[in-house]
């Protein structure tokens, strides 16, 4: 094991030294093929950085001035000029010039520029300029991407005009496509969509933000999340109740068109339903002068954490009247799908349209209402 480690360490040192050779060692002529064990043990010897090849195969590592076809390396490949075609390495591909083809490496790809290239690596891809496609298990970085970046953890680019998909986060200055991340998307300007499991952050969004928890932006008309912190948007706190006296303290936040809703509260009709939680999304239908009209989709869950449970999902129409000083009085009808256990059925205070007992649970479709008061922050 120690011998293998020492051999890999020596190979790594050789790669670093070869990569650091002076820039005057550029390709002088074109060769049909290049075969070797590792630099300089090859058919071209120490002059290999001065040759462009159409076909190269190296058992461990190889160095050339350029490649125009297929280049295969057991561990590492170094190209001091441009690369066209396909590069395949067990560990690392290093291209100093422009990549116009495909790099495939077990660990790491890097290219000076890659305007018409594709980089696929087990860990990391690095490139300057525009790289159409980067796929890695860990991290992608390029100055500009106009097609696809896919990474297990992080994508970063100055400008993205395509799709970024990352398990952890996408980070770009300007996005004109789609950002999809498991946790975080971050951009300065977005002309497209941000979709994340947790947080989206941007300054200006001309599109849609969809997050599992929070959207943050200076300007965003269509943020879809439970909490939306939009600088030029709206934030409201309110107190409301429904036909079952489920009374909630709520926080509504979002842009000029779409907002999110989160709330906590209790039920005054059924004391055992002591703890209530609510979440939803709202659409602004009308907002002018002293009157506004919202349409909300919501889910309400009540429990005592000891077996008593009640849930209600539905839509509600909420006209609101502005009373002055940011105060609004709202109230309107709702269409609710209610669910509870048979032996703990909590009857609706509204009008039951349909009900059924099935598999030990009771479900019903009801007409209800919501009334309350809220304050614009």
Please tell me what each predicted stretch does:
Residues 77-79, 93-95, 109-111, 125-127, ...:
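Sequence/structural signature of outer-membrane beta-barrel proteins
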Residues 63, 94, 126, 141, ...:
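Outer-membrane beta-barrel strand-turn architecture
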Residues 217-220, 255-258, 315, 320-377:
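Predominantly the C-terminal beta-signal and adjacent terminal strand-loop region
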Residues 51-53, 129, 174, 189, ...:
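Residues that define the transmembrane beta-barrel architecture of outer-membrane proteins
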Residues 57, 212, 226, 247-253, ...:
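Residues on the lipid-exposed face of transmembrane beta-strands in outer-membrane beta-barrel proteins
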Residues 59, 90, 106, 122, ...:
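Transmembrane beta-barrel strands of outer-membrane/channel proteins
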Residues 71, 87, 103, 119, ...:
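Residue-level detector of the transmembrane beta-barrel scaffold of outer-membrane proteins
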Residues 98-100, 114-115, 130-131, 145-146, ...:
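Repeated loop/turn-to-beta-strand initiation elements of outer-membrane beta-barrel proteins
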